[in-house]
């Protein structure tokens, strides 16, 4: 699923009434930064719940979490400044053994393009492309 980062949808489930997009432009105000973090934690908690459902669903010699890959990310590292560096991404699942789990990876500045990660994911699944969008090459994933 792709979601619109510019949505003005509110998420009362997380205890806040402010819109997603407006809150992302926090202007470095500590209260707004805190509220944006609360919104992000809520979404990560939903991802965690989804991963648990995948883990608890048998599939062949393992479970759906073993045999799938779920990508959660943002299109910006600092949404207030519209910066595309240090974009947070979470990969969940082993992709049928193609990925090692339980790691935190930070790529050097300039190498961390989301398109490089997407290119690398395709490569892990045997889909070899020279580039995707503005990619400059594969990453170690």
Question: Residue spans of the language-model regions?
Answer:
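Ligand-binding pockets and gating/stacking loops
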Residues: 1-141
């Amino acid at each position: 699923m792709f979601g619109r980062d510019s949505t003005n949808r509110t998420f009362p489930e997380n205890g806040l009434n402010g819109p997603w997009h407006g809150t992302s432009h926090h202007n470095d105000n500590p209260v707004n930064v805190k509220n944006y973090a609360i919104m992000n934690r809520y979404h990560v908690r939903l991802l965690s719940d989804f991963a648990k459902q995948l883990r608890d669903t048998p599939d062949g010699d393992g479970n759906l979490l073993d045999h799938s890959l779920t990508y959660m990310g943002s299109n910006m590292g600092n949404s207030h400044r519209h910066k595309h560096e240090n974009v947070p991404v979470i990969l969940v699942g082993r992709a049928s053994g193609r990925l090692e789990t339980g790691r935190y990876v930070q790529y050097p500045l300039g190498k961390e393009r989301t398109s490089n990660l997407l290119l690398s994911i395709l490569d892990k699944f045997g889909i070899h492309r020279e580039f995707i969008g503005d990619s400059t090459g594969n990453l170690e994933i």
